[in-house]
Amino acid sequence: MGNPVVIVGSGLAGYAVARELRKLNAEIPIVMISADHGGFYSKPMLSNALSTGRTPESILNGDAVQMASQLKIIIRPHCRVVAIDEPGYAVTLVDGEKIFYDRLVLALGADQVRLPLLGDGIEKILTINDLD
């Protein structure tokens, strides 16, 4: 087989792409690169878990090992892509490693907007965007 489909991001979109690709082709190599632990969970459940006192782990539907096994993909947790070489069909990780791809999917997700707030209650404002 040739180079894999590389998916950058392990959120809902990244896992949806991996699942759909797997439905289309059981043999295509897929590598998922995740800046975090690489487990699968519903991001909207983060605020629910926080408000009900549940642990972050309680909303995890599968860790990276389980998800890799289930989808028959390679998951590279705690890796960051720092460069994309389009003509060379490669991504470079923060440690300098290059991963070559046949197709590249950027499923980077969203970050919360931090408002420039002032005042006495500023320390009581929480933002939550991932399990960490």
Which residue stretches match the model-derived regions?
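Beta1-alpha1 glycine-rich phosphate/pyrophosphate-binding loop at the start
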Residues: 2-74
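FAD-binding core/adjacent interface of flavoenzyme oxidoreductases
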Residues: 1-6, 61-132
